[in-house]
């Protein structure tokens, strides 16, 4: 796996895009909440609520589902306005496989790029070569094999996918439990069986061996998709997530500022039921949402880019 990307050819210049640096940048977000925002005003609400970063996009996932059509990278002017409005890191999404959208976002100076299944895929066979960029990438995964393939391509952070835009946390739960269970299975295998496991996972043996030895991914593992309440966020943290992405669940609720702050606090105090009970009071109505079990196969965003 490459470990030395830099935008400066001088051997004495600091390396700005190595795997170590990019993964370290993602580590800085650990334990926090990343919120989808569509305006500078929403970005300020997220920052004031304690978000560690914001995801700039033109439509939250629930609106993408409702309105349909082709979803693409956001307008650079909109991304710039959000970057100007807040002091916390700003992420933005590109379509799966759309390396030119990624080049544009890197040139804008975003802090992280999310190669996202929420947008309409640009390439159904290939993902972006993330080693070719100095900016760190976030990618989604529904299982361990998918996570390892994205890491092999250069992802610096993995988020379990869930079903974005539904407000239904069930798929996020399934994906996080699945990834953690598969990691524990690798730990139980004798070394000579890891070769077959690597073949089954369609991932490099050395990466599989590392996970079997350490019991965790070599990058940060966040969760996403359907998280709408403080209890949802706390449950995902207790299941092994190292942080939380929240999309439609905040700004499609009755009181976005109050709910955003509550979800941030729940992520921090995820193992304290008394605090969770206190911050769950008086939040107003959560987003109405969609039962993920009723989605047709074509409407399941998590199936994209596997």
Swiss-Prot record:
Taxonomy of the source species: Bacteria, Bacillati, Actinomycetota, Actinomycetes, Micromonosporales
Assembly mode: In the presence of PdxT, forms a dodecamer of heterodimers.
InterPro entries recorded: Aldolase_TIM, PdxS/SNZ, PdxS/SNZ_N, RibuloseP-bd_barrel
Annotated SUPFAM superfamilies: Ribulose-phoshate binding barrel
Catalytic function, reaction form: aldehydo-D-ribose 5-phosphate + D-glyceraldehyde 3-phosphate + L-glutamine = pyridoxal 5'-phosphate + L-glutamate + phosphate + 3 H2O + H(+)
Gene: pdxS
GO molecular function: pyridoxal 5'-phosphate synthase (glutamine hydrolysing) activity
Positions bound to D-ribose 5-phosphate: 36, 165, 226, 247-248
Domain of life assignment: Bacteria
Protein name stated in the entry: Pyridoxal 5'-phosphate synthase subunit PdxS
Species, as recorded: Salinispora tropica (strain ATCC BAA-916 / DSM 44818 / JCM 13857 / NBRC 105044 / CNB-440)
Binding site for D-glyceraldehyde 3-phosphate: 177
Gene3D superfamilies documented for this protein: Aldolase class I
HAMAP family linked: PdxS
Pathway recorded for this protein: Cofactor biosynthesis; pyridoxal 5'-phosphate biosynthesis
Keyword annotations from UniProtKB, A to Z: Lyase, Pyridoxal phosphate, Schiff base
Role according to the record: Catalyzes the formation of pyridoxal 5'-phosphate from ribose 5-phosphate (RBP), glyceraldehyde 3-phosphate (G3P) and ammonia. The ammonia is provided by the PdxT subunit. Can also use ribulose 5-phosphate and dihydroxyacetone phosphate as substrates, resulting from enzyme-catalyzed isomerization of RBP and G3P, respectively.
EC id: 4.3.3.6
């Amino acid at each position: 796996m490459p470990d030395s990307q830099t935008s400066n050819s001088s051997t004495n210049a600091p390396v700005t895009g190595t795997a170590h640096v990019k993964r370290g940048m993602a580590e800085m977000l650990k334990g926090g909440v990343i919120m989808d925002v569509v305006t500078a005003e929403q970005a300020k609400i997220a920052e004031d609520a304690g978000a560690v970063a914001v995801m700039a996009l033109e439509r939250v996932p629930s609106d993408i589902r409702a309105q349909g059509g082709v979803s693409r990278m956001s307008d650079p002017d909109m991304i710039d306005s959000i970057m100007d409005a807040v002091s916390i890191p700003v992420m933005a999404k590109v379509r799966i496989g759309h390396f030119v959208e990624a080049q544009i976002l890197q040139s804008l100076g975003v802090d992280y790029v999310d190669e996202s299944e929420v947008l309409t895929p640009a390439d159904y066979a290939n993902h972006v070569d993330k080693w070719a960029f100095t900016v760190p990438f976030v990618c989604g995964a529904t299982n361990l094999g998918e996570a390892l393939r994205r890491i092999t391509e250069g992802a610096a952070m993995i988020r379990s996918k869930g079903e974005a835009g539904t407000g239904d946390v069930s798929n996020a739960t399934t994906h996080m439990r699945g990834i953690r269970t598969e990691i524990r299975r690798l730990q139980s295998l004798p070394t000579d069986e890891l070769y077959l496991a690597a073949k089954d996972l369609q991932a490099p043996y050395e990466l599989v061996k590392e996970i079997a030895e350490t019991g965790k991914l070599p990058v940060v593992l966040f969760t996403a998709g359907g998280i709408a309440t403080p209890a949802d966020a706390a449950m995902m943290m207790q299941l092994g997530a190292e942080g939380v992405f929240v999309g439609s669940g905040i700004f499609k609720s009755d009181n976005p500022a109050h709910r955003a702050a509550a979800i941030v606090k729940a992520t921090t105090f995820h193992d304290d039921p008394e605090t969770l009970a206190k911050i769950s009071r008086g939040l107003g109505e959560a987003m109405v949402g969609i039962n993920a079990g009723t989605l047709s196969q074509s409407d399941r965003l998590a199936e994209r880019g596997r």
